[in-house]
Amino acid sequence: KAAYAASFATDTISDEYKIMTKSLVEKLDKVGVREESGVKIVKDLGIEKAVNVLDPVFLLEKEQWDNIATKEFNEKYILVYDFDKSLVIEALAKEISKKKGYKIYTINVDKPKYADKCFNLDGPETFVSLVKNAQFVISNSFHAAVFSLVYEKDFVIVNRTESINTRMRDLLSSLTIGDRLIGKDYDINKVIEEINYDNVKPILNEKIDFSKQYLYDLLSIKK
């Protein structure tokens, strides 16, 4: 039995759940968690076998995701994927749109007033295609960050609640781009700076290799 890319989505667990959590995690032969903070949680329970692995999205090559990212769009646009109707995201999208002359595309149930185009009730092929073809991505979604990294997009992730931020904070910090997680006091000039993927990719590729090896190792366990 093993876990791959399990997520606590928090930095701590309350005392009332520690005994139960420990008893269940101890039954696993290997424990791969999505956040460094998750590794610490498991170690604090007295279990030493937890390691940090990447979200499964990263286990496929960009070219494999291209097989579903087949939709094309004729305009240059900012992609906004917002769970919370964030005023920070709205202000940021408007500001970048004005500076760059890009349209604003959103993924929402209802079209925000500031959006030029809205996509709803669409499937994964539309989501991945929108990230792939965007000039810039603004979101508070972990997987918007993940696919932005896959396609080497310039992006920012806007703070939600601290516990939800954990997985995004840990991932971005581990790739030396922790400044891509922003709050209401953002600096627009820093936000629109291009991400240096020449620095990011070697770190990310090393983590991908480690994550794949973790899977190979656990699949070779004989019971």
Please identify what each model-predicted range represents:
Residues 1-223:
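Active-site anion-handling motifs in enzyme catalytic cores
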